[in-house]
Amino acid sequence: MNTVPARNNGEKASARTVVLCADDYALHPLVDEAVEQLTLQGRLSATSCMTTSPHWRQAARRLPALRPRLSLGLHFNLTEGHGLQPAAGIGAVIARAYAGALGGAAMRDAWRRQLDAFEDALGMAPD
C-alpha cells in the first residue's frame, strides 16, 4: 500500500493509506498481466476476481505468488456472460434492482457459485 501525506490545511499533516484496486482480474489475459506487473512494481494493493470468466482457473494459479502484497476480492458478476451464460446489460440489471425484480434466490445462487469458484481455485475466502 502506498502512503501519501494528507492535505495540509494548517493542521498537522498525517499519513493516509491509499488502496488501489484493479477490477476484472481474469476478464482477459492482458488485464491479468497488468494486475500482476503493477503488483510486482508495488503500485497495486488489491484486485477483484471475475470467477465467471472462462480464464478464471488458469489466471487464479498465478495469484498465490502475489500474496500477501495483493489483497483479493470477488467481483460479483451479473452482466458479463463470457459467452457461457446469458447476461443482461448493466442498465437492465439496475432497472430490475430498482423494481425489486432481481430475485433473491437467483442472486444467492449466483453469489454462491461465484464464491465457490473463488474458494475452490484459491483455497481461501476473499480478503
What would you call each of these model-derived segments?
Residues 17-19, 44-48, 69-75, 126-127:
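Structural preference for beta-strand elements that scaffold enzyme active sites
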Residues 18-28, 97-108:
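Active-site mouth loops of central-metabolism enzymes
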Residues 23-25, 50-52, 75-81:
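Active-site beta-loop-alpha junctions enriched in small/polar residues
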Residues 29-55:
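A short alpha/beta connector and helix-capping loop motif
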Residues 106-127:
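CE4/NodB-like, metal-dependent polysaccharide N-deacetylase domain
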